[in-house]
Amino acid sequence: MLRTPKAASDPMTLTQQEMRELPLFRRLRHAVGKAVADFAMIREGDRIAVGVSGGKDSYTLLLLLEELRRRAPIDFQLVAVIIDSGYPGYRGDIVRDYVTSLGIPCHLETTTHYEIITEKRRPGSSYCSICARLKRGALYGLADSLGCNKLALGHHGDDFIETLLLNQFFVGSLKAMSANMLADNGRTTVIRPLVYASEEEIVDFMGQVGLPVVSCNCPVSDSTDLKRRRMKELLKELEQEIPHIRSSMLKALSNVHPRHLLDQQLQGL
């Protein structure tokens, strides 16, 4: 958690106009606008469910998409969706109240994910992977029930890079994330408009605007995902020697040469 949760009316929170005047907000808006254009993420008439947890990434995503919606020459709708997984102490109401204060339609879904994980998780199995699968399923279901054809998630550029490294180091797969992909259910298109934004920019932005950040209150959040944490550390170490490593690795994901890889299914492409 970045800071103690606070009400949306907290005087430290900037107004919408004050936020729009921030140079960093304009830079992030440009990054999201470029991603939306590059990957054809949003079209006329789209109804987009935006996953909002109350964390820095999802808040940033929602604010930037709302700004794009306000300025866009096409018509599309946003619906914020909040999943309360049942972790004791999670304050989904704070998130809902803030989103509602922005005039954005919002749906808070309460689930029993915490009970399911506690009862069903096998010893040694990943807590985070089970939680992620349950939450993803809930988001797809909500997008369907709310009439949304797209689901926007708050993964930023560093998430793409870290996922690439994790799959290479621990899975033996050349795989990261997609910025615009039809989900396995065949109905929901998942978009990730923060692909060109860095985690550092998002942290700085959140520090400037003072939003009511809320922790998910996962009981193992401080002790799990050690592999991803190591990837973050590795990137920081390499960045000392190669300052542009993050932008270079992100660029590599859109500059693939199949003939120079070993996957036989790619031969001839």
UniProtKB/Swiss-Prot annotation:
[4Fe-4S] cluster binds at residues 128, 131, 218. It comes from the Bacteria. A motif (PP-loop motif) lies at residues 53-58. GO terms for biological process: tRNA modification. Pathway: tRNA modification. The keyword Cell inner membrane does not apply. Its main location: cytoplasm. InterPro entries: Rossmann-like_a/b/a_fold, TilS/TtcA_N, tRNA_Cyd_32_2_STrfase, tRNA_thiolation_TtcA_Ctu1. Signal peptide: none annotated. It catalyses: cytidine(32) in tRNA + S-sulfanyl-L-cysteinyl-[cysteine desulfurase] + AH2 + ATP = 2-thiocytidine(32) in tRNA + L-cysteinyl-[cysteine desulfurase] + A + AMP + diphosphate + H(+). GO terms for cellular component: cytoplasm. Its EC number is 2.8.1.-. Disulfide bonds: none annotated. Belongs to the TtcA family. The thiolation reaction likely consists of two steps: a first activation step by ATP to form an adenylated intermediate of the target base of tRNA, and a second nucleophilic substitution step of the sulfur (S) atom supplied by the hydrosulfide attached to the Fe-S cluster. Homodimer. NCBIfam families: PRK10696.1 (NF007972). This is tRNA-cytidine(32) 2-sulfurtransferase. It comes from Pelobacter propionicus (strain DSM 2379 / NBRC 103807 / OttBd1).
